Design a protein with these regions (language model features):
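Flexible loop/hinge segments that line or gate small-molecule binding clefts
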Residues: 133-171, 187, 283-296
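Hinge/cleft segment of the Venus flytrap/periplasmic-binding protein
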Residues: 54-64, 193, 197-201, 205, ...
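Short beta-strand elements in bilobed, periplasmic/extracellular small-molecule ligand-binding domains
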Residues: 91-103, 193-198, 214-234
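Short, solvent-exposed amphipathic alpha-helices that sit
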Residues: 79-94, 172-179, 204-222, 262, ...
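Extracytoplasmic "Venus flytrap"
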Residues: 66-86, 90-94, 99-117, 123, ...
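Hydrophobic alpha-helical
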Residues: 116-145, 213, 230-289
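Hydrophobic alpha-helical segments within soluble ligand-binding/sensing domains
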Residues: 61-63, 111, 165-191, 235-238, ...
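Bacterial lipoprotein signal-peptidase II cleavage site
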Residues: 7, 17-41
Length: 341
């Protein structure tokens, strides 16, 4: 699937802060294909996702030993660790170097510092998951002006890139909403308040998930409350979820790994197994919460595929190939108690 990404650059002056780290160890995570409400749409998306996963293993040999940087939103979430693992494996196969230069927390100024450090270090290309698409755009524009190639993984900024590899987040959010709605109706619950916890109001990937989730409840008697933000911190998410539970919500949706963990822990602490918790992303903690019945399910992405294909895309464009801003959906699947590994 190819289309042009045309963005307006937003100029920003940012303070240089500490916290950018490099060369961290990785975890392991793989997932399958998108599940949507329509069987026909599901089959099409699964086909595209399998194609993406299959092609991710085809190494692209570099003409030179290029230096690449991988900059994610933080260096802690298992999602980013797994994305880095995929990137490192493909870098070895392609004959290039990838430095994992990500902040220790989800912080725009620290991510800007990472971009500036990568540029100063003489990298040929940058793979980035933008924490704040507006905030990071000025630094990315400056990097492009110096001839550095940009590829987006997971979450784009507002600067035109060579290619983007990410989940169809709105579709994934809508699937999450559909799963919650079905579970509530199975309990005989057809109305009530539903909470949403997400990382922040600016990250496009999580904003799209929230939008899709809300869409799933349109026309129903459920009321989806105003989103609360935790900056990706599981402890903050748990406090927010506990407040939601005190107010009598029937379900809570988490837009990322930290939010999802916090929701599961809050439901566990409440002792109320009727509250339906649904999340996004996959980690060992999230899987345990699903197995133990504190979360219904999570939308599991393919971060390893994002990392592998991101490296290949940078190598291809540095070798001279035009990618024309292609956008590739790397897929998402519903992980629940029945299919969890």
């Amino acid at each position: 699937m190819k289309k042009k990404l045309m963005f307006a650059a937003v100029l920003l002056s940012a303070a240089m802060l500490f916290g950018c780290s490099a060369d961290k160890k990785d975890g392991q995570e793989t997932t399958a294909a998108v599940k949507t409400e329509s069987t026909k749409a599901e089959e099409k998306t699964e086909e595209k996702t399998e194609e993406a996963k299959d092609s991710a293993g085809d190494a692209v040999k570099a003409n030179k030993p290029y230096k690449l940087a991988l900059i994610t939103m933080d260096s802690i979430d298992q999602h980013w660790v797994t994305l880095n693992e995929g990137a490192q494996a493909e870098a070895k196969a392609d004959g290039v170097e990838v430095k994992f230069m990500s902040p220790d927390t989800k912080d725009d100024s620290k991510q800007i510092e990472c971009v500036n450090n990568a540029v100063a270090g003489g990298v040929d290309g940058i793979m980035i998951a933008a924490n704040g698409p507006d905030a990071i755009s000025s630094s990315l524009k400056e990097a492009k002006e110096k001839g550095i190639k940009i590829v987006y993984v997971d979450s784009p900024a507002n600067v035109e890139a060579e290619a983007s590899f990410a989940t169809n987040n709105k579709a994934g959010g809508k699937t999450a909403g559909g799963e919650m709605k079905k579970a509530l109706e199975a309990q005989g619950i057809t109305k009530g308040d539903i909470g949403i916890i997400s990382t922040n109001a600016s990250t496009q990937s999580t904003v799209d998930r929230e939008s899709g989730f809300r869409e799933a409840f349109e026309g129903s008697d459920f009321k989806v409350l105003e989103t609360q933000y935790c900056d990706g911190d599981a402890a903050k998410a748990q406090t927010i979820a506990e407040n939601y539970i005190t107010k009598g919500v029937v379900g809570i949706f988490g837009g990322n790994e930290g939010s999802t963990v916090g929701i599961g822990n809050a439901i566990k602490a409440s002792g109320d197994n009727k509250i339906v918790g649904v999340g996004f992303d996959k980690s060992d903690t999230i899987k345990s919460l699903i197995k133990d019945g504190y979360l219904l399910c999570t939308m599991a992405q393919n971060p390893d595929v994002m990392g592998k294909k991101g490296v290949d895309a940078l190598v291809e464009c540095l070798n001279g190939k035009e990618l024309n801003g292609e956008v590739v959906d790397t897929g998402v699947s519903v992980l629940n108690k029945e299919n969890i590994q």
